[in-house]
Amino acid sequence: MSYAQTKTQSKSGYQAGVKDYRLTYYTPDYTPKDTDLLAAFRMTPQPGVPPEEAGAAVAAESSTGTWTTVWTDLLTDLDRYKGRCYDIEPVPGEDNQYICYVAYPLDLFEEGSVTNVLTSIVGNVFGFKALRALRLEDIRFPVAYIKTFQGPPHGIQVERDKLNKYGRPLLGCTIKPKLGLSAKNYGRAVYECLRGGLDFTKDDENINSAPFQRWRDRFLFVAEAINKAQAETGEIKGHYLNVTAPTCEQMLQRAEYAKELKQPIIMHDYLTAGFTANTTLARWCRDNGILLHIHRAMHAVIDRQKNHGIHFRVLAKALRLSGGDHIHTGTVVGKLEGERGITMGFVDLLRENYIEQDKSRGIYFTQDWASLPGVMAVASGGIHVWHMPALVEIFGDDSVLQFGGGTLGHPWGNAPGATANRVALEAVVQARNEGRNLAREGNDIIREAAKWSPELAVACELWKEIKFEFEAMDTV
């Protein structure tokens, strides 16, 4: 549409027509309130569109505005309900890119609904013709709004208490091949990994229910494997049983069956299933005492492009509100996308209670979580024993280090692969606790441990040359 102003005087005195968004929605003198929901957008206007007009258009189209003045504006108090573009900053090193800051009144959003927040803020405006590209970089959720959410079913401390495991990261493994195994062979793979020393095994994101492996059969054989491994090792074990299903009713049916089998943890694909389904499941998990592991399948479709989409830190914050005890975050050192500063920025947003603004890590707003439970970060994707020192140094104790191929690819089988990872982890944690520098001495620590663990020695030899050295796309 043209940005020239046009007006028509109606008989009632109402000024009809089209006017620039910035006349109403660009308010550089506005000071955000503690109760405002704040959003930072990376904005690329079309040629000829001033950044102030584009920023105001984002504020308008994601709150109360539309393309023309409407007479029903007179029936409400727009100053109370409209979004406001209150600041615009050019992006250093980029032509025609700006960070646009928008403040939204809290009354615009339904209590306890991530679905409603995202529908409002990103539901329509991303297709707006005045913008060449738009990316939601961050959201500041006000404390008043956070208090309307349950959040994670249990949180980090409750999980450790349930598992009776403290002072180290937890170890996991995704069963491979992800598709094609019968339920019985799948259960056998789970048992071998758990008896070898892992804390968890995991369904992959696309394991739901298929002709070669129906969900009920998988649950039964996995439960048998867990019971046997627990009896042999004396440790509490778990498997992330994926309850993602075609309908919410079927999802809850699968969750109930996992509960009947006395399983400690289930799993959900929160983006493909949707936030309404995820919040429903998270509340069920709290009521029934079951941990909830979250997979982020489909996230890169949304967050990979630097100038358009939604940054994963927003999806991570939304998950903490919706509910989940674990979520995949990337590894920094493995095969999946993730630059260290950016990754640890959203890992802190998942785990900590209060996070200060730090734009060097992509954190555009100070976030107070009002004591909402934290979410454990899951590092998964292309990692092996040589990565263990870096993973412990980067992610710390409140994490799950998940070795799929790094367990199942061991030449001697699943159990020795699991043992190699457990020995490496225990050696690295002991070295850290003794004051050794993991970044500088990590390889030496692994070599020393391999002298008395043949399983680890074989793993070290197999993966000594494996690296994933590509430039990260996700940078500030």
Swiss-Prot record:
<dbReference type="InterPro" id="IPR036422">
    <property type="entry name" value="RuBisCO_lsu_N_sf"/>
</dbReference>
<comment type="function">
    <text>RuBisCO catalyzes two reactions: the carboxylation of D-ribulose 1,5-bisphosphate, the primary event in carbon dioxide fixation, as well as the oxidative fragmentation of the pentose substrate in the photorespiration process. Both reactions occur simultaneously and in competition at the same active site.</text>
</comment>
<feature type="binding site">
    <location>
        <position position="204"/>
    </location>
    <ligand>
        <name>Mg(2+)</name>
    </ligand>
</feature>
<dbReference type="InterPro" id="IPR000685">
    <property type="entry name" value="RuBisCO_lsu_C"/>
</dbReference>
<dbReference type="GO" id="GO:0000287">
    <property type="term" value="F:magnesium ion binding"/>
</dbReference>
<dbReference type="InterPro" id="IPR036376">
    <property type="entry name" value="RuBisCO_lsu_C_sf"/>
</dbReference>
<keyword id="KW-0503">Monooxygenase</keyword>
<keyword id="KW-0120">Carbon dioxide fixation</keyword>
<comment type="similarity">
    <text>Belongs to the RuBisCO large chain family. Type I subfamily.</text>
</comment>
<keyword id="KW-0479">Metal-binding</keyword>
<dbReference type="Pfam" id="PF02788">
    <property type="entry name" value="RuBisCO_large_N"/>
</dbReference>
<keyword id="KW-1015">Disulfide bond</keyword>
<dbReference type="InterPro" id="IPR033966">
    <property type="entry name" value="RuBisCO"/>
</dbReference>
<keyword id="KW-1282">Carboxysome</keyword>
<keyword id="KW-1283">Bacterial microcompartment</keyword>
<dbReference type="InterPro" id="IPR020888">
    <property type="entry name" value="RuBisCO_lsuI"/>
</dbReference>
<dbReference type="InterPro" id="IPR017443">
    <property type="entry name" value="RuBisCO_lsu_fd_N"/>
</dbReference>
<protein>
    <recommendedName>
        <fullName>Ribulose bisphosphate carboxylase large chain</fullName>
        <ecNumber>4.1.1.39</ecNumber>
    </recommendedName>
</protein>
<dbReference type="GO" id="GO:0031470">
    <property type="term" value="C:carboxysome"/>
</dbReference>
<feature type="site" description="Transition state stabilizer">
    <location>
        <position position="335"/>
    </location>
</feature>
<dbReference type="GO" id="GO:0009853">
    <property type="term" value="P:photorespiration"/>
</dbReference>
<dbReference type="GO" id="GO:0016984">
    <property type="term" value="F:ribulose-bisphosphate carboxylase activity"/>
</dbReference>
<feature type="binding site">
    <location>
        <position position="174"/>
    </location>
    <ligand>
        <name>substrate</name>
    </ligand>
</feature>
<dbReference type="Pfam" id="PF00016">
    <property type="entry name" value="RuBisCO_large"/>
</dbReference>
<dbReference type="GO" id="GO:0004497">
    <property type="term" value="F:monooxygenase activity"/>
</dbReference>
<keyword id="KW-0113">Calvin cycle</keyword>
<feature type="binding site">
    <location>
        <position position="205"/>
    </location>
    <ligand>
        <name>Mg(2+)</name>
    </ligand>
</feature>
<dbReference type="InterPro" id="IPR020878">
    <property type="entry name" value="RuBisCo_large_chain_AS"/>
</dbReference>
<keyword id="KW-0460">Magnesium</keyword>
<feature type="binding site" description="via carbamate group">
    <location>
        <position position="202"/>
    </location>
    <ligand>
        <name>Mg(2+)</name>
    </ligand>
</feature>
<feature type="binding site" description="in homodimeric partner">
    <location>
        <position position="124"/>
    </location>
    <ligand>
        <name>substrate</name>
    </ligand>
</feature>
<keyword id="KW-0560">Oxidoreductase</keyword>
<dbReference type="GO" id="GO:0019253">
    <property type="term" value="P:reductive pentose-phosphate cycle"/>
</dbReference>
<comment type="subunit">
    <text>Heterohexadecamer of 8 large chains and 8 small chains; disulfide-linked. The disulfide link is formed within the large subunit homodimers.</text>
</comment>
<keyword id="KW-0601">Photorespiration</keyword>
<feature type="active site" description="Proton acceptor">
    <location>
        <position position="176"/>
    </location>
</feature>
<keyword id="KW-0456">Lyase</keyword>
<feature type="active site" description="Proton acceptor">
    <location>
        <position position="295"/>
    </location>
</feature>
<feature type="binding site">
    <location>
        <position position="296"/>
    </location>
    <ligand>
        <name>substrate</name>
    </ligand>
</feature>
<feature type="binding site">
    <location>
        <position position="328"/>
    </location>
    <ligand>
        <name>substrate</name>
    </ligand>
</feature>
<feature type="binding site">
    <location>
        <position position="380"/>
    </location>
    <ligand>
        <name>substrate</name>
    </ligand>
</feature>
<keyword id="KW-0602">Photosynthesis</keyword>
